[in-house]
Amino acid sequence: MDSVYKTDENFAADVAALLAPLPTPQLQEYFNKLITSRRCNGIEVKNNGTIGKGVYANSEFDEDELILKDEILVGIQHSSNKVDCLVCSFCFRFIGSIEKQIGRKLYFKNLGVSGCCDDDSSEEDECVKYNGNEEQCGGSSSSHNTLPEGVVSSLMNGEMALPHTDKFPLPSPLSCPGGCQEAFYCSESCAAADWESSHSLLCTGERSESISREALGEFIKHANDTNDIFLLAAKAIAFTILRYRKLKAEHVDKKAKQSEPKQSLLLEAWKPVSIGYKRRWWDCIALPDDVDPTDEGAFRMQIKNLACTSLELLKIAIFDKECEALFSLEIYGNIIGMFELNNLDLVVASPVEDYFLYIDDLPDAEKEETEEITRPFLDALGDEYSDCCQGTAFFPLQSCMNHSCCPNAKAFKREEDRDGQAVIIALRRISKNEEVTISYIDEELPYKERQALLADYGFSCKCSKCLEDSSSI
């Protein structure tokens, strides 16, 4: 661990520059460009002197109207969820076919492997090793009817077709261009975008651009055994390194008379990550209920040491000398802390659930005939038939939305929203120039419980609901 701490010591000035807030004009320019590229011209990001940046409406929104669809900067599907759902590793859209989705799930279930879809994963989580919103996701069933292995294999391999699945077409899976067996895609464009943005450094395949595939494998195993948020932090670092290399190459191509300092190129490459509010992970993570307050110091040191071990493995795997400041523990801790404070659950509804609901809505005679074929599969899946894709992601614009216990907007996936983008919908009419707010917590909780939860985010809520509740105590 010494080398990680030495990086913090030797690159203290560079680390401080990376973690320094962007000047307001640069921040405004960045978000203006982002809003233009997202084509969401009904909003703007503005800095408020008292609460920092926020999202404001520059046009009126009606109740249930779409405010924003925000693309992911970095996101992951939870490791445990990969046995339940085969999705594109870049946009998180379901891929393959209804038959393949059902076949994979039953195959892993027959092996005794199931996803542990726990959104509140901790450093002690045991996640499945895998090779190859407000919406409610399906739970797990302790018992199920096992189908013959040959039937399951036929489903997975496309040798068996179920009735009416043509109504639910899915993109064919494309393998990772680097040759790993972990990443699959819905299209060539998603495969290329993921490769260029981060996966080329994080791929474990033969064409990986990492400097040690063995160390990368150890890093991934450590993350899967402890907390898969490390995989997301690795994506942020790989994203910045690759962006730095691209900016440097473009600068060389321009044959500029004056060489651009490496630090300014690194700061520019880091900019998309720099805009998120940050605190060190071990400082901002909520104290678990089963940890005695007297043990808080030891708990937070344990979290810090866990991050240090993870970073050491990542550094061996993808280290870049020109971007060495990125491999400081201070940077790593702040990246993960940014996710802790800003991330939104990544949820994509399963087309398998839609398929069985479609069967259930068929006319009685046709339904009875169809269910003679489909019912054994539904029974074998149990409650897990409706499992959705679950993960976590950082969304640049959504992360700027401030909290209110009486919010005027919410994250909500509509029927047509079939990928990992964040979808923000108006809960009521929103006036022009009004701030767009969402709730970070369950706003129906009692006042003191709300304030305790929000303290983990580093603020005390003073929305109209909290002011009213506090006056009655």
Swiss-Prot record:
Zn(2+) binds at residues 176, 180, 199, 203. S-adenosyl-L-methionine binds at residue 440. GO terms for cellular component: nucleus. PROSITE patterns: SET. It holds the Pfam family zf-MYND. GO terms for biological process: callus formation; epigenetic regulation of gene expression; lateral root formation; methylation; root regeneration. SMART domains: SET (SM00317). A zinc finger (MYND-type) spans 134-203. Residues 33-441 form the SET domain. Disruption phenotype: Reduced callus formation from somatic cells associated with an impaired reduction of H3K9me3 deposition and lower accumulation of H3K36me3 at LBD16 and LBD29 loci during leaf-to-callus transition. Lower lateral root formation and impaired ability to form adventitious root formation from wounded leaf tissues. The double mutant jmj30-2 atxr2-1 is strongly impaired in callus formation. It catalyses: L-lysyl-[histone] + S-adenosyl-L-methionine = N(6)-methyl-L-lysyl-[histone] + S-adenosyl-L-homocysteine + H(+). The keyword Transferase applies. InterPro entries: ATXR2-like, SET_dom, SET_dom_sf, Znf_MYND. Belongs to the class V-like SAM-binding methyltransferase superfamily. Histone-lysine methyltransferase family. TRX/MLL subfamily. Histone methyltransferase that methylates 'Lys-36' (H3K36me) of histone H3 to produce H3K36me3. Promotes early stages of cellular dedifferentiation through H3K36me3-dependent, and to a lesser degree H3K4me3-dependent, activation of Lateral organ Boundaries-Domain (LBD) (e.g. LBD16 and LBD29) genes. Positive regulator of root organogenesis including lateral root formation as well as adventitious root formation from wounded leaf tissues. Recruited by JMJ30/ARF (e.g. This is Histone-lysine N-methyltransferase ATXR2.
